[in-house]
Amino acid sequence: MYDISGWKHVFKLDPNKELSDEHLEMICESGTDAVIVGGSDGVTIDNVLHMLVSIRRYAVPCVLEVSDVEAITPGFDFYYIPSVLNSRKVEWVTGVHHEALKEFGDIMDWDEIFMEGYCVLNPEAKVAQLTDAKCDVTEDDVIAYARLADKLLRLPIFYLEYSGTYGDVELVKNVKAELKQAKLYYGGGISNAEQAKEMAQYADTVVVGNIIYDDIKAALKTVKAVKGE
C-alpha cells in the first residue's frame, strides 16, 4: 500500500480529454508520485475505465477522484471524495456523499478512501459553476475553511483549487501555516516549472493538470521542479 502523505507532485488527468498513448506513457514514467483521474464534466464509466486500463500498464499509483457516483469502478489504488466546503449547495458538501454511502457503503474499503475538503477560488472554473461555489471570499474566510477541514472535520486533505488560473502564493503560505494534520493540496494554473516550484514551497502536494494537454514538455518539467530529484 502506498503512503499518500509523502506525495509531493501528482498529475491530474481528465477522462473527458484526449491524451495520446505516447503522452500518457511520459506522464506515468515521469517520476510523479501519483496520477489522479478526475474532471468536472463528461466523466463516464466508459472513459474512466479506459483511463484506468491505460494507466495500469505502468507502476505509478492511480487515484480516482469521484465526481459522479455512476463512474465509480474498482481497480484504483485510492478513491478521493471531494467535499466543496465553500459550495452554496449542500449536495456538494455532504449530499452526494450520503447517497453514495447509502448505495455502496457496505462494500467500501475504507483504507482506500480519503475525503478532500475543497475550497474553490476561481469563479470562472467549471467546478465553481457546477457546485455554485462562493469564490468572492477573503483570506480570513479561506483560513476558516482550512480550520474547518483540519480541526473540526479532521479531513486528511485540504485542497485549494484555482482550476485554470494561478493562485495567490501568499494565501497558500498562510493556509499551510494553519494546518496541523491535513495535507495541503494546491491545484490551478501551473504552466511551467517555476510556478510549480514556487507553490511547492508551501503546498504539501502540487497538482498539475491542464498544462498536460497544452504543453507536455512543460508539464513534465514540473516533476523535477517540485521533487528536486
Curated annotation (Swiss-Prot):
Q: Which metal ions or organic cofactors does this protein require, according to UniProt?
A: Mg(2+)
- Annotated binding of sn-glycerol 1-phosphate, by residue: K12, Y159, L160, E161, Y162, S163, G164, G189, G209, N210
The keyword Magnesium is annotated on this UniProt entry: yes
Q: Which GO terms describe its molecular function?
A: heptaprenylglyceryl phosphate synthase activity; magnesium ion binding
Q: Which residues cross the membrane?
A: none
Any Pfam family the entry gives: PcrB
Q: Which SUPFAM superfamilies match?
A: FMN-linked oxidoreductases (SSF51395)
Family annotation (CDD domains):
PcrB_like
Specify the pathway: Membrane lipid metabolism; glycerophospholipid metabolism
The UniProt catalytic activity note for this protein reads: sn-glycerol 1-phosphate + all-trans-heptaprenyl diphosphate = 3-heptaprenyl-sn-glycero-1-phosphate + diphosphate
Enzyme Commission numbers on file: 2.5.1.n9
Q: Which domain of life is it from?
A: Bacteria
Task: Kindly state which keywords UniProt assigns to this record, in alphabetical order.
Answer: Lipid biosynthesis, Lipid metabolism, Magnesium, Metal-binding, Phospholipid biosynthesis, Phospholipid metabolism, Transferase
Q: Where does Mg(2+) bind?
A: D14, S40
Record's signal peptide: none
Q: Does the keyword Isomerase apply?
A: no
Q: Which GO BP terms sit in this record?
A: glycerophospholipid biosynthetic process
Protein family according to the UniProt entry: Belongs to the GGGP/HepGP synthase family. Group I subfamily.
Its biological purpose is as follows:
Prenyltransferase that catalyzes in vivo the transfer of the heptaprenyl moiety of heptaprenyl pyrophosphate (HepPP; 35 carbon atoms) to the C3 hydroxyl of sn-glycerol-1-phosphate (G1P), producing heptaprenylglyceryl phosphate (HepGP). This reaction is an ether-bond-formation step in the biosynthesis of archaea-type G1P-based membrane lipids found in Bacillales.
- Summarize subunit and interaction data from the UniProt record for this chain: Homodimer.
* Name of the protein described by the UniProt record: Heptaprenylglyceryl phosphate synthase
* Organism taxonomic ancestry: Bacteria, Bacillati, Bacillota, Bacilli, Bacillales
